[in-house]
């Protein structure tokens, strides 16, 4: 922290200049954006996606942010502090912040500087704790401590940011599976998906506005450098990354040389046993909307925020996995573990098997039976919720059956 403080004094307490001075992982300048754009153009990617991605990776985001605030508004948030989930879980909060600092997603400074820095706003923080999941810091950009206050999310707009399309992901994925089954009625279709690690953090704020997204925890002022979970513009500005990645992954899925590059990762994934001789595959019937795939060797990828869903035959699934990883590295940079973490979430990569039946986006999909279903955990959770919602309990009979 002393290093950052000394540099900030040297640059006359100017946060944008400090960020530009730091460079490297702090700004994402290690990425070869020109090469990425060239590959996207050669692969006939949508020009809008290319332009949005280039802006995000070189200029930063939001695309547009024009706002003003007052000293009184600043003090409303400064005096409020953080939500009780932070103050009651100091140890967990500190652990989460140390991880963010280690990955160079934040700049830590003494909190007393908050009154002296230009264009600074303080946003309350919360800690989301769920069973069997890592604790997640919540940047509560929509919260206001009183009706006179104006939050950062109230100063921003969706209209000027990239289009959000991930709401159609699951539907698109299921339609792909249906058409796949039309084209391969007697072959195993395996399901898999991978995640981007710290996805939103890879999209960097424009240095001139980074301090508007600041927050204070304990004695430290934190300046975030990448997208915060809770900002209304963060998901939209990750969309060009996701869309460019899925486009490149499909383009790379034709190649058969990438598996050798990533076999040290892919070979660790457990793949379900082949079907037995008596296995029956449920057929999919062609119609005017679904006629099958033009080329079953090409893989279609669909991303729901940071989660990339795909499916392939047993002969091609590993090539699809390699294509997905390569596309991620082309967009966000190749791993250099001595200086930064792998953008691929390896812990999630190995925690489940590649199979004809897999839970994707919380829904169990089975490509042999061509069915989708709630997981037992979700079904029981719903039953428990409904038991408190309706006193007479009549609504439960359908779900129990």
Protein language model features and the residues they cover:
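Short acidic catalytic loops
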Residues: 138-141, 191-195, 296-312
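Hydrophobic side chains in beta-strands
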Residues: 65, 127-128, 139, 217, ...
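Conserved aromatic-histidine-acidic binding/catalytic patches
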Residues: 81-88, 226-237, 296, 300, ...
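Residues that flank catalytic or metal-binding motifs in active/ligand-binding sites
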Residues: 121, 211, 304, 359-361
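Polymerase palm active-site segment centered on the conserved acidic dipeptide of motif C
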Residues: 164-172, 257-272, 279-296, 300-302, ...
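Surface-exposed beta-strand-to-loop junctions
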Residues: 72-80, 215-227, 301-305
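Catalytic-core region of right-hand nucleic acid polymerases
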Residues: 88, 92, 97, 101-253, ...
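Reverse-transcribing Pol proteins
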Residues: 1-162
């Amino acid at each position: 922290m002393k290093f950052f403080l000394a540099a900030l004094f040297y640059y006359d307490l100017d946060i944008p200049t400090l960020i530009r001075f730091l460079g490297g992982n702090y700004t994402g300048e290690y990425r070869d954006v020109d090469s990425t754009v060239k590959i996207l153009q050669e692969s006939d990617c949508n020009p809008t996606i290319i332009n949005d991605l280039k802006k995000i990776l070189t200029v930063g985001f939001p695309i547009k942010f024009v706002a003003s605030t007052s000293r009184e508004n600043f003090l409303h948030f400064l005096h409020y502090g953080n939500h009780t989930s932070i103050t009651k879980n100091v140890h967990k909060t500190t652990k989460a912040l140390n991880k963010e600092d280690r990955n160079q997603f934040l700049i830590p400074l003494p909190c007393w500087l908050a009154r002296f820095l230009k264009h600074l706003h303080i946003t309350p923080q919360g800690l989301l704790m769920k069973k069997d999941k890592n604790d997640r810091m919540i940047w509560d950009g929509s919260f206001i401590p009183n009706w006179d206050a104006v939050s950062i999310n109230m100063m921003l707009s969706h209209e000027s940011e990239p289009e959000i399309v991930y709401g159609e992901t699951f539907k698109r994925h299921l339609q792909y599976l249906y058409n796949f089954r039309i084209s391969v009625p007697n072959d195993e279709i395996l399901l898999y998906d991978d995640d981007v690690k710290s996805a939103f953090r890879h999209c960097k704020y424009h240095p001139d506005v980074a301090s508007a997204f600041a927050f204070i925890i304990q004695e430290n002022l934190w300046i975030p450098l990448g997208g915060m979970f809770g900002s209304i513009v963060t998901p939209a500005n990750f969309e060009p990354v996701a869309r460019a990645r899925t486009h490149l992954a499909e383009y790379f899925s034709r190649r058969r040389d990438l598996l050798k590059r990533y076999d040290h990762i892919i070979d660790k994934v457990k793949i379900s046993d082949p079907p037995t001789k008596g296995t029956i595959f449920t057929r999919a019937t062609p119609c005017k909307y679904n006629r099958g795939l033009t080329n079953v060797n090409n893989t279609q990828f669909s991303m729901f925020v940071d989660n990339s869903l795909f499916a392939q035959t047993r002969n091609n699934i590993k090539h699809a996995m390699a294509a997905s990883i390569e596309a991620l590295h082309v967009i966000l940079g190749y791993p250099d573990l001595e200086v930064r973490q792998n953008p691929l979430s390896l812990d999630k990569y190995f925690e489940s098997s590649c199979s004809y039946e897999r839970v994707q986006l919380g829904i169990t999909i089975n490509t042999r039976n061509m069915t989708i279903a709630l997981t037992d955990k979700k079904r029981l959770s719903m039953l428990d919720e409904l038991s408190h919602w309706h006193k007479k309990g009549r609504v439960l009979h359908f779900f129990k059956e």
